[in-house]
């Protein structure tokens, strides 16, 4: 709900001298133990019920179905844009306070796992997409215990679809990879994407490793790819990146190319919520799943969140 603690306190303080002090709070459901409940909403409800909260307290719970300004047809349209197995559907549509737990991309994992029996996977494409307007590469640098990851993503015209074109992950668990060797891995990946799909419009890298980024720029220049635009990733809030990906999957606007994205498929099928985080939503990052590849993929789409939503 993006209600920062300092913002809440400041908003309250600004009304201390008001003649008719009123605070209106409108929000979507969150984690049941989020501070917005434990420190404010539920706390005030308890105090009011006990007669200890002066000034009054009103609480109403509404869902999408209670909105009289939205037609039934539009409500069904909105509901169809969510994966019914996701926490976003439970919260935004059903209005429930739920903990983020289990698989993050359950619908995707189900489609991949059932493919051996049904020979169908609705997220997989086998033919080269004809209408790509942008091809973006994301790079995440790993250290000991993780790995370096490259992901190439194609975006179709008018931001209608996300199509992951290729992914590659290099293990660093036994020691980091030499920067020159990493640079060559990067160049090989770029040429593979160029030869198969066409021009690369941008490369976004993990901004925490400026030395490695400069190394990629230098290697690219030496090997005929000096025109590549290699910049820092935006590093949007992780839950917002996850939310977009789940939303695109639910609307069948997310795909990946067959035989080219093994590391990404594995990463998505094993991504889970952190079971130890009872207050906030957090993706588990303890080495049991490939977070490097997930980050690299998300770097390719995070700058366009509003555009993907705008063209729904």
Description of each model-found segment:
Residues 1, 26-28, 139-141, 153, ...:
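Short His-Asn-centered micro-motif
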């Amino acid at each position: 709900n993006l209600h920062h603690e300092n913002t809440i306190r400041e908003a309250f303080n600004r009304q201390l001298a008001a003649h008719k002090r009123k605070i209106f709070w409108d929000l979507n459901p969150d984690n049941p133990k989020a501070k917005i409940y434990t420190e404010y909403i539920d706390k005030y409800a308890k105090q009011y019920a006990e007669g200890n909260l002066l000034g009054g307290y009103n609480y109403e719970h509404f869902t999408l179905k209670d909105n009289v300004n939205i037609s039934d047809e539009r409500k069904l349209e909105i509901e169809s844009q969510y994966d019914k197995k996701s926490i976003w559907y439970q919260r935004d549509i059903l209005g429930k306070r739920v903990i983020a737990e289990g698989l993050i991309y359950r619908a995707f994992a189900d489609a991949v796992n059932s493919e051996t029996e049904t020979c169908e996977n609705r997220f997989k494409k086998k033919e080269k997409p004809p209408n790509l307007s942008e091809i973006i590469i994301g790079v995440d640098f790993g250290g000991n215990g993780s790995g370096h990851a490259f992901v190439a993503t194609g975006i179709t015209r008018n931001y209608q679809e996300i199509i992951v074109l290729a992914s590659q992950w290099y293990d660093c668990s036994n020691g980091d990879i030499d920067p020159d060797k990493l640079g060559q891995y990067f160049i090989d990946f770029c040429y593979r994407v160029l030869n198969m799909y066409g021009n690369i419009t941008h490369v976004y890298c993990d901004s925490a490793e400026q030395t490695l980024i400069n190394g990629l720029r230098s290697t690219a220049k030496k090997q005929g790819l000096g025109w590549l635009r290699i910049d820092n990733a935006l590093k949007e809030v992780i839950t917002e990146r996850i939310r977009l990906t789940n939303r695109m999957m639910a609307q069948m606007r997310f795909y990946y190319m067959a035989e080219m994205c093994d590391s990404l498929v594995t990463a998505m099928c094993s991504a889970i919520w952190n079971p130890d985080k009872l207050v906030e939503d957090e993706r588990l990052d303890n080495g049991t799943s490939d977070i490097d590849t997930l980050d690299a993929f998300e770097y390719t789409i995070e700058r366009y969140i509003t555009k993907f939503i705008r063209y729904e």
